[in-house]
Design a protein with these regions (language model features):
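Bacterial N-terminal signal peptides that target proteins for export
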Residues: 2-12
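Bacterial N-terminal signal peptides
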Residues: 11-20
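Structural microenvironment flanking redox-active thiols in thiol-disulfide oxidoreductases
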Residues: 68-121, 134-137, 259-299, 311-317
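Thiol/disulfide oxidoreductase modules built on the thioredoxin-like
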Residues: 122-124, 133-176, 300, 307-357
Length: 370
């Protein structure tokens, strides 16, 4: 049906296989770069010439394995800084090449703007550099996935290439291959190169944008259906559809934030639906044609309903007390049927994603891929 997309299946398979790889030391040298950091500064390789050791870690915001090592990365950085060395965190992904459901384990993507959010939230005190346009560092180092750590000594010879630490104990400094190699290299004049297998998610480049665009096009062609329900049907949905992380959105096309909210919900649903998120939109307008048009513009192929405004009483108890408005109402229920969000007005996309993630509970990092 989609000949161009079918032609890319082999390429997609290669991407999936490459996330578990054994890096080879091919005489890689300390890479040259000129990259922007999350602090707005430009970073060049020669400005670290006085440092004894330089550690470069390729990391992805969206990669759950990268995330699991954040605490250890910070701890290793503290040791390096105290000994006139430095750790550079580098994001090599082109954010436009990510598929929606590849973001299902993260509150943010891999753009420089989202890197700033992650850096601030996690209190990164080391340079966090964006290399998503050209992958200059990962290309020079022949890296294929994140996380991937590289360690260079005073003469800028590569002494380590591989994983950050033990995947089963990602916060254990004693089991960190990277840190133990650093300690050994500091205490030895001999260059002993260490290589370990890396396990993570494939680096996304501009060559992968075509696949991502094809997937987005297929999403845009999904059918958007809408049907009328009554109060009894709404009660049924509220009673029997709250066993999973569930969103309800009560809205009117007249709402000031209607269009933006629908776009946020559409994006959020595409990201998390494969992990089990359920979404019900309920419109209180009488114009079914206009309602469907708004949903189609937002490409919102969830469970969409129209319900007369005088039959929304099952939802009234969830409306915040400090408002006289009924729409737009966003409700997020946990798996245990607790109300996580009950808000009138504009949707806070970042806050919503974080609450959804917390309820979905990230699966064991040993799964590797998702």
């Amino acid at each position: 049906m989609y000949p161009k997309f079918k032609a890319t299946k082999y390429a997609l398979l290669v991407l999936i296989v490459s996330v578990i790889s054994f890096p080879f030391l091919q005489g890689e040298k300390y890479p040259s770069f000129n990259l922007e950091g999350t602090d707005g500064k430009q970073y060049h390789q020669i400005q670290f010439k006085e440092k004894e050791f330089i550690c470069i870690i390729l990391y992805s915001n969206h990669c759950k394995i990268s995330q699991s090592f954040e605490g250890l990365i910070k701890e290793i950085s503290e040791h390096l800084v105290s000994e006139n060395s430095i750790l550079l965190l580098v994001s090599p992904n082109n954010e436009n090449a990510l598929l929606p459901d590849e973001l299902a384990y993260s509150d943010v993507g891999d753009s420089i703007k989202e890197m700033r959010i992650r850096s601030k939230d996690r209190n990164f005190e080391f340079p966090y550099l964006y290399d998503g346009l050209e992958q200059s560092i990962s290309n020079q180092l022949s890296a294929k996935s994140t996380p991937h750590a590289f360690l260079f000594n005073k003469t800028r010879n590569l002494v380590y290439s591989g994983r950050i630490g033990d995947y089963n104990e990602p916060n254990n400094l004693k089991k960190s291959d990277l840190y133990q190699t650093y300690r050994s290299a500091r205490n030895s004049a001999q260059i002993n190169q260490v290589v370990t297998k890396v396990h993570g998610t494939a680096i996304k480049t501009k060559e992968d944008i075509f696949i991502a665009n094809e997937v987005r096009r297929r999403y845009s062609e999904e059918s958007v259906n809408i049907r009328s329900i009554n109060q009894q049907t709404l009660k049924f949905f509220l009673k029997y559809n709250l066993g999973k992380t569930t969103l309800f959105y009560l809205w009117s096309a007249k709402d000031e934030s209607s269009r933006e909210n629908l776009l946020i919900l559409s994006e959020t649903f595409k990201i998390f639906r494969k992990r089990g998120l359920k979404l019900f939109t309920i419109n209180v307008d009488k114009d079914q044609k206009e309602t469907k048009l708004q949903l189609e513009k937002a490409q919102l192929s969830a469970s969409n309903f129209i319900l007369p405004g005088n039959e929304i009483s099952p939802l009234v108890r969830y409306i915040p007390n400090n408002t006289t408005r009924v729409t737009p109402l966003t409700l997020l229920f946990s798996k245990e049927q607790q109300t996580l969000v009950s808000k009138i007005g504009a949707i806070d996309s970042l806050m919503l994603k974080r609450l959804i993630l917390k309820d979905l509970k990230t699966s064991n990092i040993k799964n590797g891929r998702y």
